[in-house]
Amino acid sequence: AHATSSHGLAHAAASVRIGVAKSTKPDTAEATEAALRQLASKLGGATPDVVLVVLCGANPQEPSPYDLEACLARLRVGEHALAASTKVVATTSCMGIAVESQWVGGNAIALMGICDPEGSYEVCYADASQGSEAVRERVAAAAARSGREEPPAVSIVFTQGHETTSLRGIQAALGEEAHLVGGCIFLANPPGLAVSPGGGGRDESATSGLVMLLCWPNATVAS
């Protein structure tokens, strides 16, 4: 049996910081920098272990003003640049985005940063057009990198096509009871998905497939 004191749980929860930020500036570099500045303030200057990025265009009938790869590059430079070790998972979207219980319609770049040095977080991209086995291999490899024996407490998934194939591959890697949250972003114009594993790993970006953020947080997660 294993028991954890309420003080221990409180300490674990206190060591985890989550912050969200946004910018509606129409220029990719300016919006990214503004969102980074806001995120740094929300996190009290702490270095996030992982950052989730959403580039939102206003109307799916018109191209978004934001460039995904330019945003990824901008995240790593400047006064509020992410650390080289920070992992990033990014996607494009459209119409609007919810940030801190507020609906932001139209163009926006939004960030969510998690500071949890005692937790484990991994990101991965998979080309779902190659079949569910290709997805399984990528997701299983990401899970193995964490060094955790148990499945992730929760995983965030964004897909661009091949949703059924993606889910089959994920479940084959993590089990059918895996806790998943996310969705399909097929209306994004242009479509885009990307991961930046940090630590010198190779960035990957594509217009289809799936990206995942696998989370083993240092806090209790209710199922």
Region spans (language model):
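Cofactor- and metal-binding active-site motifs of prokaryotic enzymes
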Residues: 9-223
